[in-house]
């Protein structure tokens, strides 16, 4: 095993200028991530300098077998925390050979919204709180839970410490450091209310970069759980009953909201979101109806309301924002399996266009 470990951690820069680029894309389910690697002649820092590539879309549920080629367009580069050195992770979106975005390519439409002059002028910031659950590999039951049974009731686990309360911290901290190494603007982590469930936060990030960073942070987490022999679940309600679900609360502000008088801008934006509540819910993740029940710090899926410091609301405004008269708000509706390109661009579109 030591020889294998040595080879995995081999420093290529001693013998070659070539680097490895891991191309990453969203798969056919719209939630799964796929990747493959290629050798490049030297370091690259600009995604526009990277070659386009292709893959077999019939094997990912994204193209028919008789016309299976899907083209990868590199969009964002991050440092590779696994191979290190000058090696990179490349977030791509996906197109037909004719250059048309395929249905699972949600980045293309989002980029159009974020490049609109009215949106650019407002410099939209996003901070996404990604909740997730770690499952035992062979039985798909949360780590730290007794086989075929349940732990004690919720209460001691949120931000908890100790072997009987916090399960999987080694994975969480490994992910935290790997994201920082990669150049992702990860801003924190914490244990969640349900044991075996955790959260990391990405942001504040501007516009389309929020989606790029969250997808790559998910990819890194998937790779780390793969190494650890643990299953990563983004199911919004992995365990039925009196247990919290998993969301992706999305914090949002614009330049006008962050400036003096921004609280009035925030209230008008929330009013706009309320008018399109059903459209947003339809785009905020699969299975969200199992999570948005009006219990466990959620609003009922069929209602829309906002409140200050209210974690049972659809939209929460913080006490500091109310006090200072400017700041941001939190959309608490998105599910843990949401597509960040869809959610962030939809919030920007509804509030700014």
From Swiss-Prot:
Q: Does the keyword Cytoplasm apply?
A: yes
Has the keyword Disulfide bond been applied to this entry? no
Which reaction is this enzyme known to catalyze? L-glutamate + NH4(+) + ATP = L-glutamine + ADP + phosphate + H(+)
What is its subcellular localisation? Answer: Cytoplasm
Q: What class of enzyme is it?
A: ligase
Q: Which InterPro entries match?
A: Gln_synt_N, Gln_synt_N_sf, Gln_synth/guanido_kin_cat_dom, Gln_synth_cat_dom, Gln_synth_gly_rich_site, Gln_synth_N_conserv_site, Glutamine_Synthetase
Enzyme Commission identifier(s) = 6.3.1.2
Subunit comment for this entry? Homooctamer.
Q: Where is the GS beta-grasp domain?
A: 19-99
What residue stretches are annotated with the GS catalytic domain? 106-353
Q: Which organism is it from?
A: Lupinus luteus (European yellow lupine)
Protein known as = Glutamine synthetase nodule isozyme
Q: Entry's SMART domains? A: Gln-synt_C
Q: Which keywords, in A-to-Z order, does the entry hold?
A: ATP-binding, Cytoplasm, Ligase, Nitrogen fixation, Nucleotide-binding
Q: Which family does it belong to?
A: Belongs to the glutamine synthetase family.
- GO cellular-component terms in the record? cytoplasm
What are its GO biological-process terms?
Answer: glutamine biosynthetic process
GO function term, MF aspect, one = ATP binding
């Amino acid at each position: 095993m030591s020889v294998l470990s040595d080879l995995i951690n081999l420093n290529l820069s001693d013998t070659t200028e070539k680097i490895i680029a891991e191309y990453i894309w969203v798969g056919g389910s719209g939630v799964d991530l796929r990747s493959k690697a290629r050798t490049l002649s030297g370091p690259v820092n600009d995604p526009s300098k990277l070659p386009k590539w292709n893959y077999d879309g019939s094997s990912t549920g994204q193209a028919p077998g008789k016309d299976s080629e899907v083209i990868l367009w590199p969009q964002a580069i991050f440092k590779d925390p696994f191979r290190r050195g000058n090696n990179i992770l490349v977030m791509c979106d996906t197109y037909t050979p004719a250059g048309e975005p395929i249905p699972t390519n949600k980045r293309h439409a989002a980029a159009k919204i974020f490049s609109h002059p009215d949106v650019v002028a407002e410099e939209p910031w996003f901070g996404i709180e990604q909740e997730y659950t770690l499952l035992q590999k062979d039985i798909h039951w949360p780590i730290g839970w007794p086989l075929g049974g349940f732990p004690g009731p919720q209460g001691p686990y949120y931000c908890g410490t100790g072997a009987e309360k916090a399960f999987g911290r080694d994975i969480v901290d490994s992910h935290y450091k790997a994201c920082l190494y990669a150049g992702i603007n990860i801003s924190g982590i914490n244990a969640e209310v349900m044991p075996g469930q955790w959260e990391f936060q990405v942001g504040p990030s501007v516009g389309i970069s929020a989606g790029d960073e969250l997808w790559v942070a998910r990819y890194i987490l998937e790779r780390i759980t793969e190494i650890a022999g643990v299953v990563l679940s983004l199911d919004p309600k992995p365990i039925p009953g009196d247990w919290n679900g998993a969301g992706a609360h999305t914090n949002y502000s614009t330049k006008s909201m962050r400036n003096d008088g921004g609280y009035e801008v925030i209230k008008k934006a929330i009013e706009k979101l309320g008018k399109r509540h059903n459209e947003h819910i339809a785009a905020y993740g699969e299975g969200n109806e199992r999570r948005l029940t009006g219990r466990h710090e959620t609003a009922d899926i069929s209602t829309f309301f906002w409140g200050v410091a209210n974690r049972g609301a659809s939209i929460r405004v913080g006490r500091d924002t109310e006090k200072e008269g400017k700041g941001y708000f939190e959309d608490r509706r998105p599910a843990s399996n949401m597509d960040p390109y869809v959610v962030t661009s939809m919030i920007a579109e509804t509030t700014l266009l």
